[in-house]
């Protein structure tokens, strides 16, 4: 190991050492478009199985937002990652976990049925909505983004990460319908598109979000973050729709 190489220390379980490989690169599109936040990469903690994607959200909430702000905040966590879910349950008195595919998942604690395109929640109900790598799976992404915006309170933050390409415009084909076709087009059988970074920001802003782009690798690289993955902090501010 070189003197400059970052040593991984898992923020969830405290493991120190090398990360494990995760993901797959069976379909060339992920490499061809240099998709960030997807594909084969060294990113899984061998002890608690946390991934770079959930550690990124954790890093923002713990190191940037600060945990004390979470205590009395209303938090909605869609498709909850186990380690992040456990941590949020320990920090927030008002945490709700939800997913539209309860039968296919193994969760920690209570998880409610929630369709992010049509939720049962009131306008402006949540201070935080965490929907990490979910929007890319939804056919009507604009409807989902509008629904998150509706239930997010003014001054609230939505974390709406998706796989990103920076070398192509957004890839989305109306004639791609089957799992096999989606695998070839987008790299995953359940994805509906691959977003370009600038296209995605414009989409978020068109819904009404104020978007701040952060890269937390410098300063927190030891948490095993993806150096290339930017965090899109989506805020609902006064004066927007």
Question: Which ranges hold each PLM region?
Answer:
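Activation segment
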Residues: 104, 120-123, 138-139
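Hydrophobic beta-strand segment of the Class I
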Residues: 78, 129-130
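PRPP/pyrophosphate-binding module of the type I phosphoribosyltransferase fold
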Residues: 130-132, 143
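S-adenosyl-L-methionine-dependent methyltransferase catalytic module, highlighting the catalytic core
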Residues: 3-8, 12-15, 139-148, 153-240
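Short catalytic micro-motifs in class I SAM-dependent methyltransferases
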Residues: 133-137
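Conserved N-terminal segment of class I S-adenosyl-L-methionine
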Residues: 1-118, 215, 219-241
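A short acidic, Gly/Pro-enriched loop at the edge of an enzyme's catalytic core
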Residues: 116-129
């Amino acid at each position: 190991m070189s003197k400059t190489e970052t040593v991984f220390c898992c923020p969830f379980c405290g493991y120190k050492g090398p990360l494990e490989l995760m993901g797959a690169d069976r379909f060339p599109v992920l490499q061809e478009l240099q998709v960030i936040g997807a594909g084969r990469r060294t990113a899984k903690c061998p002890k608690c199985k946390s991934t770079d994607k959930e550690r990124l959200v954790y890093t923002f909430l713990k190191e940037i937002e600060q945990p004390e702000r979470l205590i009395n905040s209303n938090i909605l966590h869609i498709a909850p990652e186990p380690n992040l879910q456990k941590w949020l349950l320990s920090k927030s008195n008002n945490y709700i976990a939800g997913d539209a595919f309860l039968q296919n998942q193994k969760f920690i604690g209570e998880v409610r049925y929630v369709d992010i395109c049509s939720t049962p929640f009131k306008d402006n109900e949540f201070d935080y909505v965490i929907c990490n790598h979910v929007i890319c799976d939804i056919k009507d992404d604009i409807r989902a983004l509008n629904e998150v915006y509706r239930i997010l309170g003014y001054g609230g933050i939505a974390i709406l990460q998706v796989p990103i390409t920076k070398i192509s415009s957004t890839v989305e084909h109306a004639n791609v319908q089957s799992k096999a076709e989606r695998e070839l087009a987008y790299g995953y059988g359940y994805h509906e598109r691959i977003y370009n970074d600038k296209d995605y920001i414009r989409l978020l802003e068109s819904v009404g979000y104020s978007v701040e782009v952060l890269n937390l690798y410098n300063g927190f690289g030891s948490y095993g973050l993806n150096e290339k993955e930017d965090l899109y902090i989506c805020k609902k501010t006064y004066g927007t729709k």
